[in-house]
Amino acid sequence: LDVKYKLEFLSILQEMKHQKKLTVIMSLHELDLAERISDQILCVNGTTPERFGTPQEIFTKGYISKLFGISSGSFDEKTMNAELPKPCGKPSVFVISGDGTGRNIYRKLQRKNIPFATGILFENDLDYPVAKALATEVISTESFEPIKGKTLEVAKVTLSECDHIICCRPHFGTFEKANEELLSYAKQLGKIIK
C-alpha cells in the first residue's frame, strides 16, 4: 500500500478496534507504524519470540539494531530513523545547520560518500539524530543552554580543517550566536561557502 492508503487502512482498523472492542493482530515490518499503532508488540527473532511489550518497552536504545543484526548503517529508536553507513575519512565539508535544515544535505553528502562535520547543534535539534548517524564529527551542545566558548573553539578548529562550508541557515536564533560567529569565521578564512 502507498502511504495514503496505508494510513487510511490503519486508521480504520484503529477505529474498529475502539468501537467494536476488537483485538487486531498484524504482522508489520514498518517499525514506525508498529510503534504508532500498536498497544503491544511481539518481536520475533528468526522463528523465536524474543520480546513482548508496549512500544516504549520494545523501542529501547540499541534493541532494534540487536534484534535485526544491523551492522551496516544505524537505526535510532527515539526518532525511528534508519540511516545508511556514514562516509569514512577526514571531513572535507563542514555543515552549519539546525532546525531541520541540514538533514537533506547530510543525506546528499552520504550518498556522494563525502565525509563531513557539522555543528554546532543542540542535542534536541531536528538535525541532531541524522547528524549523529551520518557525520564523521558532530559538534553539539546541551539543549536549552547557551553555547559555551570552548564548544565554539572546537567547531572553529574543525571548520578550519575542512575545504568547503555549507550554511543551511538563512538566519540564526538568539541562542545560536555562536553559529553566526562560526559562519563569520569561515568567511574570514576565505572558505568556499555554499
Where are these regions (language model features)?
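ABC-family nucleotide-binding domains
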Residues: 2
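Receiver (REC) domain switch/active-site residues of two-component response regulators
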Residues: 39
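Helical segment within the ABC ATPase nucleotide-binding domain
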Residues: 6-19
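ABC ATPase nucleotide-binding domains
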Residues: 68-149, 167-169, 173-177, 192-194
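H-loop/switch region of ABC-family ATPase nucleotide-binding domains
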Residues: 28-29
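Conserved switch/coupling elements of ABC/ABC-like ATPase nucleotide-binding domains
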Residues: 42, 46-57
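A short, surface-exposed alpha-helical micro-motif characterized by mixed small hydrophobic
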Residues: 34-36
